[in-house]
Amino acid sequence: MLAPKSFNYATVRVVPRVERDEFVNAGVIVYSSEQNFLDARIEVNEARLLALWPALDVSMVARHLQAICRICAGDPAAGPIARLSKKERFYWLTAPRSAVIQISPVRTGLSSDPKSLLDRLARELVGTG
């Protein structure tokens, strides 16, 4: 078994009505510089989002959430941010903002398998299948 290495992660939240501070966890971003890993898991739960704000444009939110995955992957079609280093992309994605899509505080831990960790965090925090 490989020795555990440090990682950082943050939860992606959709805050349909920013003034109410209600949110739905929609994804997780995991970054490990020691393992050269940056990836995200996103799941759009339309029913939960519409329960908070029936007028929400869920398809627009879904497009913005999928951009997070493309930026993590370094997809050139995702724009200039996707061309930054993995470290720069992670910290750009996790910067605080007051918008419909927000990010939790960054948390840290140890893992020898960041992909399995990402899958587990997505199941536990977002409820992905």
Regions found by a protein language model. Give the residues of each.
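Polybasic/polar functional segments that serve as interface/processing modules
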Residues: 1-129
